[in-house]
Amino acid sequence: MSSTHSRRIKFVSISVPILYGNHAIKLTPEKRKPTTPPEHTHEWTVFFKPVLGDIDLTPLIKKVTFKLHETYENPVRTLESPPYQVTETGWGEFEIIIKLHFQPGVELGINEKNFQIFHALKLHPYNPQAPQAQQPQVQQSQAQPPQQQFGGEGGSVGTVIRERENGEVHSVLYDELVFNEPTEKTFEILTSKPVNLIPYKLSNLDKRDQEYIRPDEIDELNRMDIYIDKVKQEIENQRNQYKLLEQEKLALLQ
């Protein structure tokens, strides 16, 4: 049975919409613990989850690891069951490596490569107009992150960074795990429920910054169309300017 389940289905791709990112909020005196370092300014939670909250990926995913900055004690955190998230405190922003480890095995018929994601931890709302001196400090790591290895292919739409009235910062990114020619067992797991359907409505209005719904994708595509038009217009402007310069050059040579 294992050899049958480990056979790959040719000319088939299946995707799983996912969300990953972090939530952060400034530390208040009430939230500080005796063990909290005095220089830490924020509490944050980094996470990975399927878009549809009722989808169980444990038959497919053995564990999820989060590689934090090397200055943290035990920088590689391992979670073998959902919720796949890590909560910590800190003062700086840095890159977190999220790695999905699939169930090992030809014996299970899964036999998929691990999937690695890089997430830039955000503690502050994004403000491109802020002066350089006011930009948040970043913890730097000497170690270079390993090369990305994909069990599927990513199709990220873009990071949504929002600040709520209470000061919480939410940096959430939509992506898709795409399995090309999955094994029969992987296909069976991923088709047991409609995992690739993005909901049209929020499960809870208070989770606006934590969920991804179909209108978000439509809004993002509309924004992309606007910027594509702007780029096309700029290319046309540059082309016209180049023609004028060429005409001026020819006039000077006559």
UniProtKB/Swiss-Prot annotation:
Keywords: Activator, Chromatin regulator, Coiled coil, Cytoplasm, DNA damage, DNA repair, Nucleus, Transcription, Transcription regulation. Its main location: cytoplasm. Residues 129-149 have a biased composition (Low complexity). Pfam families: YEATS. Residues 218-254 form a coiled coil. The keyword DNA repair applies. One of its GO terms (biological process) is response to heat. It is found in: Cytoplasm; Nucleus. CDD domains: YEATS_Yaf9_like. GO terms for molecular function: chromatin binding; histone binding. Residues 8-193 form the YEATS domain. Signal peptide: none annotated. The keyword DNA-binding does not apply. GO terms for cellular component: cytoplasm; NuA4 histone acetyltransferase complex; nucleus; Swr1 complex. Component of the SWR1 chromatin-remodeling complex and of the NuA4 histone acetyltransferase complex. The coiled-coil domain is required for assembly into the NuA4 complex. Belongs to the YAF9 family. Component of the SWR1 complex which mediates the ATP-dependent exchange of histone H2A for the H2A variant HZT1 leading to transcriptional regulation of selected genes by chromatin remodeling. Component of the NuA4 histone acetyltransferase complex which is involved in transcriptional activation of selected genes principally by acetylation of nucleosomal histones H4 and H2A. The NuA4 complex is also involved in DNA repair. Yaf9 may also be required for viability in conditions in which the structural integrity of the spindle is compromised. This is Protein AF-9 homolog. It comes from Candida albicans (strain SC5314 / ATCC MYA-2876). The lineage of its organism: Eukaryota, Fungi, Dikarya, Ascomycota, Saccharomycotina.
